[in-house]
Amino acid sequence: MKGGKRIQSTRQNRINSEIRAHEVRLTGLDGEQIGVVSLKEALEKAEEAGADLVEISPNAEPPVCRIMDYGKFLYEKSKTLKEQKKEQKVIQVKEVKFRPGTDEGDYQVKLRNLIRFLEDGDKAKVTLRFRGREMAHQQIGMEVLNRIRQDLDELATVESFPNKIEGRQMIMVLAPKKK
């Protein structure tokens, strides 16, 4: 007959009766070192303090355990993880499309958008699309891309600049300069 299924704990740290060692290196509520004590004695001290006995590093010899309020510990841990996640900035690639015949007013609006994207810390992808007979005037497209590059010179560095046309478009990628 097979043994019963063992329910695997989802906790990262073993607490109280889950700890398997006979002796543990104990740390008190305020972080003071108590020393190497038996598991039974450590559990008694934790109960006296009205807290949990938490195994901090199970691979140490003997395992290191701390007397603490486990619920509060988990709350603090999740709080710090949320803070770290909030501070992380995900860099996105924003795309702005131009045409060889893009007029001055439209050019300025699109340039303003590019500046905003770069100031927000995002990368910008400039796509220059050729339609119909515009393919015959590829040098106009290169002039537009060079003008964009010059206008954004103090804000961005060019990550990739097209040497030749790919299909019916030229693509330039800009990254914000580090401050």
Swiss-Prot record:
A Pfam family hit: IF3_C
Record localization: Cytoplasm
A single BP term in Gene Ontology: ribosome disassembly
PROSITE patterns: IF3
The keyword RNA-binding is annotated on this UniProt entry: no
Main location group: cytoplasm
Site annotation Important for 30S binding: residues: Y107, K110
Entry's Gene Ontology molecular function annotations: ribosome binding; translation initiation factor activity
GO cellular component, one term: membrane
Source superkingdom: Bacteria
Listed PANTHER family: TRANSLATION INITIATION FACTOR IF-3, TRANSLATION INITIATION FACTOR IF-3, MITOCHONDRIAL
Similarity section: Belongs to the IF-3 family.
Task of the protein: IF-3 binds to the 30S ribosomal subunit and shifts the equilibrium between 70S ribosomes and their 50S and 30S subunits in favor of the free subunits, thus enhancing the availability of 30S subunits on which protein synthesis initiation begins.
Quaternary structure note: Monomer.
Protein name as it appears in the record: Translation initiation factor IF-3
Organism ancestry: Bacteria, Pseudomonadati, Pseudomonadota, Gammaproteobacteria, Enterobacterales
Gene: infC
